Amino acid sequence: AANYDIGHLFGASGGGGNAGCIGCVCSADDTKGRGITSPADGIPQGDNFDIDYVVHEVGHQLGGNHTFSQSNESTGVNKEVGSGITIMGYAGITNQDVAPHSIDVFHQASIAQIQANLPTRPCPAGQIITMTANQPPVVSPVPNYTIPITTPFALTGSATDPNGDPITYNWEQN
């Protein structure tokens, strides 16, 4: 069990996915190798397989819980309406779907969970991690607003990147 950090089986016989654990990456026992993804349609390929199944289950192995709110799991991260739409949601597979498939982003709550879990894990053992010189974007501050419920609104934001990297904007309700 010491020769790998994470294990995940890919199949084509149906059954969906199961991480086998939450946050077990690099564990000393065999729980880190219990992940499986085998889509119901028997076609283990394409964006739907990669995002809705594989990355979702690996997200569990890295420490992320579900973000959908169609049922409360008492994890404190059930942030998204209905089935949710980000990677750790259940888009397209509940009776409260808001979209047929996930979008390829983690919710901020998932990122926070994974970032909190990884430093507690004993990996990568004996390896040196080299930080890059990439700098985070600088977000222009905006004032806070309170608007009445059901009021239509538009969100506008701006930021600059010290490295000149392209910027993608994403708003989440929290």
Tell me what each language-model feature is.
Residues A1-N174:
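Extracellular (secreted or membrane-anchored) zinc-dependent metallopeptidases
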